[in-house]
């Protein structure tokens, strides 16, 4: 596009004056200053443009003045020269140039601003103009406080109907509408092409306009599209369409500028550096008729529909960037106008939106941070906060606890405690006279919830509420929502709990409540619930969790105090017997027997569980125990579990927190086995793979000592910390067919140094790095390490095995080493034999079953047996039994 002429008719004379002023200033410079000026000049220039060095290298003062005037134009050339003179240490000449410029041209300082300087002024204007927005109650608030970030998904993402009501879209499908996501909207594709039109679509009221204004604000704040967009303009389509008369695009731009001296022609001369935000484009009229013909000239006065239509169709400024907001049903109607748009769907809350909500609710930053931090640590509760109403409930409870000065870690550590606190807060806030009635209504509500859970019902008729005298009560208003459905003769009214989880919580609470102090068949009812929960795919899982959470001594006291009734201890004893019974008949886990030929294939992480697959039942039992937060009860419940075996669990942080708590409370002699489990969080896995690629690209080998110390805490860090607790009696840990990242090995190594009861460690068919083996060996060699038995199965040769063997010279407690199934090259066997004969080696038993050994290696081992007759070395060839064929060899 040709650059439009300057609006002033005196451009020619002003150019001559500028050339004269430039020459006068440059002639005052010495040769050294002029040389320095030329070098500084090639590094500066508005809008990222600078005069090519070839034109400057041999230019004298006359040539430089001409080049400046022709390349930049009158005012920009003078401003560039002034700044360059200052940088060339000719400040006196720069001051004289500025003074003569004002005298000769006679212009105000606002008009003297170049495009580059006006960018700063315009950004400041936008920041001031859009810093505050009005809420629906007309209260003015800061946009940074008002804006709630959204999830934005590409057009190809799964439809919203594919998700449950409380399910949050995965990060791969949708991204938060933060600056990173906004920047990605105009990201180049695989072929290097950048979209010029992006459409944000979504239903009414989801926040498209606010998001568009936040994009404009963030751009002005320097957070978005740096180096890409010089000017961004917000165009409210509805207002522009209703505005009478005709106006050009240049006029609309000028209306948004802080003054009438804006260099609009120069702005329009580089349309590729402009961003137009068209908000509410679905309000544009349909195509058709001459009045709807798109405008093609930015200086042509036309109707709002024609100007906006020209921008949408790219007939006007085809290289400019467009961000269009529209309702979800409207993009089809806009397709005829849009030119190769890229669409994105605006969705609801993201995880970080929850944090935003907490800070809005509390306002006091310190309290908000405390409340949010504890909720973030409870993954179950944090997931529920995807629903704004649940966020409100949680915040209400936490605010009450903070106002009372209570410790959140004690009163709000589980989902059960938070829900109970919310209900008791309702009772506490009621007048004393209304207390008994409210208690009775809550008991009836719990009974209704229980009947619904057991009968798999979520909808309740009005007559059911009337029978329980709940209709019109305060508890109905607080905990039930009303739905009106069109019926055949009249509207059908039904009620449902504000959240399914609340129904399940109240159902669990019903088992602990009594009527009039006379115990009901609570224990029998609990037995029915628990027997039902033991069935696969049970719908009673969450109710059972809540029940255990209510059985802690502290929760039971709260119930008695607020509900005015006695809670039967029989309920707790029934639940304890049920858990202990699960320990005797717990679903089995595949034994640690794997064909040696499988090798490291078995160390692959488990695939995503298919829908409908039975959940990991032992882990669910641990969740129930975790809810109690009562150490003695958990320890007593786990007495009937000789081992905790978890198979194919894709551990999340909440899973680890649950397991860690139960391990800390485990009784003496208990074992833990993790088989084919994923031991790294999804986001950590991505970071780890990136780190490996970077290490490979830099030619890095195994991790160095310094590198491993800088590793972040692993996903299993809380578990290993629990193992070091003085009250933890875990005696055996086995990790089988898992990938063990270096961070896991580092954290486990540190735990081995302090675990008070751990005497046996099994590392079977795991994928380990050389650095990982080294760190584990260091932990086993630590003087305070109490591990007596180590079982290692490494089907493939491992360079780090020498660290494990070398550890035998220092390990004070180790008496048994089982290397069955490992591949031991001859040099490794030679090294092993040398270590076994070291005076510091206290090993008593070495198992080499299913290990292929050369004749020389066998002879070396025989020599060790003769030198140390008390050392038991088991191998078929050493025991006089022939070595079985390779295809029959199997590891345990």
From Swiss-Prot:
Post-translational changes noted in the entry: Polyubiquitinated with 'Lys-63'-linked chains, promoting the interaction with PYCARD/ASC and formation of the NLRP6 inflammasome. Deubiquitination by CYLD decreases the interaction with PYCARD/ASC.
Underlying gene: NLRP6
Principal subcellular localisation of the protein: cytoplasm
Disulfide cysteine pairs (residue numbers): none
GO molecular function per UniProt: ATP binding; double-stranded RNA binding; lipopolysaccharide binding; lipoteichoic acid binding; molecular condensate scaffold activity; pattern recognition receptor activity; peptide binding; signaling adaptor activity
A GO CC term assigned to this protein in UniProt: cytoplasm
Alphabetical list of CDD domains matching this protein: Pyrin_ASC-like (cd08321)
Phenotype upon changing residue 21 to R: Decreased formation of an inflammasome filament
Result when mutating residue 53 to F: Does not affect formation of an inflammasome filament
Name of the protein described by the UniProt record: NACHT, LRR and PYD domains-containing protein 6
Annotated Basic and acidic residues bias: 170-181
Region: Disordered, residue numbers: 158-181, 352-356, 590-614
Lineage: Eukaryota, Metazoa, Chordata, Craniata, Vertebrata
Domain notes: The poly-Lys disordered region (352-356) mediates the formation of liquid-liquid phase separation (LLPS), an essential step for nucleation and formation of the NLRP6 inflammasome complex.
Domain annotation Pyrin: ranges: 1-103
InterPro entries: DAPIN, DEATH-like_dom_sf, LRR_dom_sf, NACHT_NTPase, NLRP_HD2, NLRP_innate_immun_reg, NOD1/2_WH, P-loop_NTPase
Functional note: Acts as the sensor component of the NLRP6 inflammasome, which mediates inflammasome activation in response to various pathogen-associated signals, leading to maturation and secretion of IL1B and IL18. Inflammasomes are supramolecular complexes that assemble in the cytosol in response to pathogens and other damage-associated signals and play critical roles in innate immunity and inflammation.
